[in-house]
């Protein structure tokens, strides 16, 4: 009996169902952080300021179904849109797969748990502030959202 490879290894982003596409989101929340664009160089500057709809504990949108109505500049990721988006974090599953890479061990589709993205230190949990409290974005420029994280390996729990 042969094991069937996971869908993200056998289908292109264009071929995925809506459910498969949505499941690629690891729930890190990095894409929901505000970004600035440097005028002269056009460089993306990441901040640690989260969209007001991002739940800073779960790192998920608190109103995903209505997000684009409530936050008009919220970007809807699609396979076609990926080519024009240069600000997705390097750890983002959509970006990784579009670049021909694979998902990391901490991705929920690989680990089988939605908690590994937090346990590995990949998510914005404990690192971001809501836009409601932040003040000027220029005061919150941060490098970490735009770098490939060096995840912490989970602790092995030994039976007592």
From Swiss-Prot:
The protein, known as: UPF0260 protein GDI1595/Gdia_1801
Organism field: Gluconacetobacter diazotrophicus (strain ATCC 49037 / DSM 5601 / CCUG 37298 / CIP 103539 / LMG 7603 / PAl5)
UniProt similarity note: Belongs to the UPF0260 family.
Lineage: Bacteria, Pseudomonadati, Pseudomonadota, Alphaproteobacteria, Acetobacterales
Disulfide links within the chain: none
HAMAP family: UPF0260
């Amino acid at each position: 009996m042969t094991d069937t490879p996971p869908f993200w290894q056998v289908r292109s982003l264009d071929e995925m169902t809506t459910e498969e596409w949505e499941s690629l989101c690891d729930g890190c929340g990095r894409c929901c952080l505000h970004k600035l664009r440097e005028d002269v160089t056009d460089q993306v500057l990441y901040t640690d300021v989260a969209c007001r709809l991002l739940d800073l504990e779960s790192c998920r949108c608190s109103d995903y179904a209505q997000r684009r109505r409530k936050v008009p500049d919220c970007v809807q990721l699609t396979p076609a849109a990926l080519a024009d988006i240069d600000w997705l974090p390097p750890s983002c599953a959509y970006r990784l797969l579009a670049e021909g890479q694979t998902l990391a061990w901490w991705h929920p589709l690989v680990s089988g748990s939605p908690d590994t993205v937090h346990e590995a230190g990949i998510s914005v949990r404990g690192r971001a502030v809501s836009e409601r409290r932040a003040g000027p974005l220029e005061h919150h420029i941060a490098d970490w959202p735009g770098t490939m994280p060096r995840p912490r390996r989970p602790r092995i729990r030994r039976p007592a």
